[in-house]
């Protein structure tokens, strides 16, 4: 290390040629907001010189472009990109995301510690700096069947891994507020590190108590007044814009130069189709500026503020001593990325091809005790005053509705006239044969069934449909393929996307996943679906830590009271 330090010192002073120099660029200073012509000198993976001229062994002609620090996605689930960490790397890094802080709790809910082992091994080999927050709540609640349970000892075993930042989103709010021993043990074990929050709609003294546990960031704010209270109480609010949860427009009125140290950006869940059509963090920056945010505030939130919030002191600025994560832009306000430097390396196909790929784990994870039948989907009882989930497009929060539904010989039926479909959650981890049954409004589904083995957070199979036979067909198809998404009508598979890695991720290139998603969306529309992202919207129906009405393999849950209805 001593020799490395002395090389940096010598090259920074100009005593010897730097390893790489970026010439003829305008550096966007995140302290003052100035655009300053300069060379950027790099030694290995570190910046060693700015605001001067340098000679280098290698040189990049900036051609007058604008240099900004690499972007940091402060909270995401790689699994929600539907591809492996290596394809995520190849898909997202060209959009300027040089650091991604992931929570592998999707895979952890299926595989337990094996998910941490896989992600940490992959993180050592990706080009981007993939960091891991350890999944704090596996399972999220006791009101569902998960594939694994992680206790404090499981988490502590990874605490000092160099790729680990701290604890991921602490979703068990009642456990924190009521002093659940398992929750308190986890909070105490990571008290000297970062603890990420998950606090939808929390306010007042309940929020105070939650923050007093040592939690410092939150990505679940969906309204400006909610976010304002949280930043006033010391939280860093991570403004989220994913494939389902779209909170940016509601929150960016709070983001300005004065408040930017207390805001960062995240995507949480964003798939390759959205990335292809819109972008990743580059889209969030571009959209924020379109909505009136000053560029200085937007780029600070995307890098410097994010680095500060998560204790990554070696990045977030283009300055000597910082990690050489640099994005070259053709246009600052439109955030048009032209080149990316990650740890001093120009990002290109050759760099991606040099990686050593870690073999995927969790194959054949969809385990049903027997094929399901149409009879398994039946809902018995009265149709009067039935609890119904109301889907809100662009949100994972649902409405708690009560509607009268049609009946036939003691069975409650879906009602396309009211836009009400049946929804079932089928346990798929081989532990039991549970099936939760209920109803949902808002898909627009007129016929057939849609099913997904992605079902946050325990990832049982969630299926929505108007036909019990098609619903059963869809569930059985997912077991045969090892998991994924499928659209079925009249007993025929119209389209599917295979996700054999833990039933969550494809082992195919991200371009193929993107193309398969296009076909799936088109198939869903022929069945009447009106949602822009029906499969990810479907995948959040079983998440009982998000208000107001949800469904697991145990049944329908009133999230406010955490009781079955």
Swiss-Prot record:
It catalyses: adenine + H2O + H(+) = hypoxanthine + NH4(+). Its cofactor is Mn(2+). The gene is ade. This is Adenine deaminase. One of its GO terms (biological process) is adenine catabolic process. Belongs to the metallo-dependent hydrolases superfamily. Adenine deaminase family. It comes from the Bacteria. NCBIfam families: ade (TIGR01178). CDD domains: AdeC (cd01295). InterPro entries: Adenine_deam (IPR006679), Adenine_deam_C (IPR026912), Amidohydro-rel (IPR006680), Metal-dep_hydrolase_composite (IPR011059), Metal_Hydrolase (IPR032466). Its EC number is 3.5.4.2. Keywords: Hydrolase, Manganese.
